UniProtKB/Swiss-Prot annotation:
Domain LRRNT, chain residue ranges per copy: 28-66
Signal sequence, renumbered to the chain: 1-18
Ranges of the LRR repeats in the UniProt entry: 67-88, 91-114, 117-137, 138-159, 160-181, 185-205, 206-227, 230-250, 255-276, 277-296, 305-326
Modified residues (Pyrrolidone carboxylic acid): Q19
Stored PANTHER family: AGAP008170-PA (PTHR45712), LUMICAN (PTHR45712:SF6)
Protein name: Lumican
Subcellular location per the Swiss-Prot or TrEMBL entry: Secreted, Extracellular space, Extracellular matrix
Glycosylation sites: N88, N127, N160, N252
Any one Gene Ontology BP term: response to Aroclor 1254
GO cellular component labels: extracellular matrix; extracellular space; fibrillar collagen trimer
Assembly with partners or alone: Binds to laminin.
C-alpha cells in the first residue's frame, strides 16, 4: 500500500510529538576536580555539588562527602543500598541510579525518606518488583521505568510529586488505582508498556500528560476523561479499542492538544473538541471521514484547530474525503492518508 502525504498549507519541518521532560545533568564546563569527592568519582571544580560515579562497575554506593547535592551512579553493578549510605548528605537533591542491579529487598530501611531535600529519584533499568519507599515529601520526580514492577506501595503525603515514570513494567490496573489517587500535584504519568486491560480508576485529576499506550485496554468508561479538566496530552495507541468500547464523547475535552489512538481497531473517528491540534489515527480500520467528528457546525469562526492529522494505514482513501473537510480543517498543516 502506497502512502502519500498531501499538504493543505505547508508541511511543518520537524517531528510532532507530545510533551517529554528531559532532565539532563546540570550544565557546566568540566575542569579541575573538587577535593570534596569520592576518589573513584568525578566532582568538577566548576560544579562542586555534583558527583559523577557513572560507568565504574561499582557494586555498592561509594562514600558520599558532605555538600554533594547531585549524585549520579548510572551504569554500574550496584545491587544494594545500606540504610546509612547517604547519612553524610541529607541535603541531597538528585539521586540517579539508572542501569544497576537493585532489588527491593536490598534497599534498606528508610534510606530515601531521610533525604528531606530530595527532588529527583531515578531508578530506571533495575530489578525492582514494586515501587520503593518510604519517600520524602520533597520528592517531585520519580522514575522507575524498565523494571519488573507489579505492585505499587503507598504514595501518601507526597504533596510535591509531579512526575511519575512507570513505563515498561508489569502493572495491572488494580495496582495503579489503589496507589495514585491521592497525588494532588501529579501532572505527568507514564504507564505505557504495562499489562492493563482497563483504565485505572481514581487517577489524579491534576494530570496534564497521561500515556497509556501499549497496554491491552479494550474500552473507556463513559465520561472517564471528563474529570481531567487540564489534560493536554493523551496516548492510547497500541491497545485494543474498538468502536463499541469508545463512548461518543470520550475525547471531547476542551483542554486536549494531542490525542494518539493509532494502532487500535476503530472503524469510525471518535469525536474530539475543536481545540485539539494533533490527532493520530493511523493503522485502525477507518472506513469513512465524518466532518462532525471535528466540527459540530461550520462557519467563519467555527472550525477545528487540527494542525496534524494521521489517517494512513486505514481503508479510508484520499478520494473518499468529503469536500467540506477542507473548510473544517482549514488551519491544518499536514494530513496523511492512503
Amino acid at each position: 500500500m502506497n502512502v502519500c502525504t498531501f499538504t493543505l498549507v505547508l508541511a511543518l519541518v520537524g517531528s510532532v510529538s507530545g510533551q517529554y521532560y528531559d532532565y539532563d545533568a546540570p550544565l557546566f564546563m568540566y575542569g579541575e576536580l573538587s577535593p570534596n569527592c569520592a576518589p573513584e568519582c568525578n566532582c568538577p571544580h566548576s560544579y562542586p555539588t555534583a558527583m559523577y560515579c557513572d560507568d565504574l562497575k561499582l557494586k555498592s554506593v561509594p562514600m558520599v562527602p558532605p555538600g554533594i547535592k547531585y549524585l549520579y551512579l548510572r551504569n554500574n553493578q550496584i545491587d544494594h543500598i545500606d540504610e546509612k549510605a547517604f547519612e553524610n548528605v541529607t541535603d541531597l537533591q538528585w539521586l540517579i541510579l539508572d542501569h544497576n542491579l537493585l532489588e527491593n529487598s536490598k534497599i534498606k530501611g528508610k534510606v530515601f525518606s531521610k533525604l528531606k531535600q530530595l527532588k529527583k529519584l531515578h531508578i530506571n533499568y533495575n530489578n525492582l518488583t514494586e515501587s520503593v519507599g518510604p519517600l520524602p515529601k520533597s520528592l517531585q520526580d520519580l522514575q522507575l521505568a524498565n523494571n519488573k514492577i507489579s505492585k505499587l506501595g503507598s504514595f501518601d503525603g507526597l504533596v510535591n510529586l509531579t512526575f511519575i515514570y512507570l513505563q515498561h513494567n508489569q502493572l495491572k490496573e488494580e495496582a495503579v488505582s489503589a496507589s495514585l489517587k491521592g497525588l494532588k500535584s501529579l501532572e505527568y504519568l507514564d504507564l505505557s508498556f504495562n499489562q492493563m486491560s482497563k483504565l485505572p480508576a481514581g487517577l489524579p485529576t491534576s494530570l496534564l500528560t497521561l500515556y497509556l499506550d501499549n497496554n491491552k485496554i479494550t474500552n473507556i468508561p463513559d465520561e472517564y476523561f471528563n474529570r481531567f479538566t487540564g489534560l493536554q496530552y493523551l496516548r492510547l495507541s497500541h491497545n485494543e479499542l474498538a468502536d463499541s468500547g469508545v463512548p461518543g464523547n470520550s475525547f471531547n475535552i476542551s483542554s486536549l492538544l494531542e490525542l494518539d489512538l493509532s494502532y487500535n481497531k476503530l472503524k469510525s473517528i471518535p469525536t474530539v473538541n475543536e481545540n485539539l491540534e494533533n490527532y493520530y489515527l493511523e493503522v485502525n480500520k477507518l472506513e469513512k471521514f465524518d466532518v462532525k467528528s471535528f466540527c459540530k457546525i461550520l462557519g467563519p469562526l467555527s472550525y477545528s484547530k487540527i494542525k496534524h492529522l494521521r489517517l494512513d494505514g486505514n481503508p479510508l482513501t484520499q478520494s473518499s474525503l468529503p469536500p467540506d473537510m477542507y473548510e473544517c480543517l482549514r488551519v491544518a498543516n499536514e494530513i496523511t492518508v492512503n
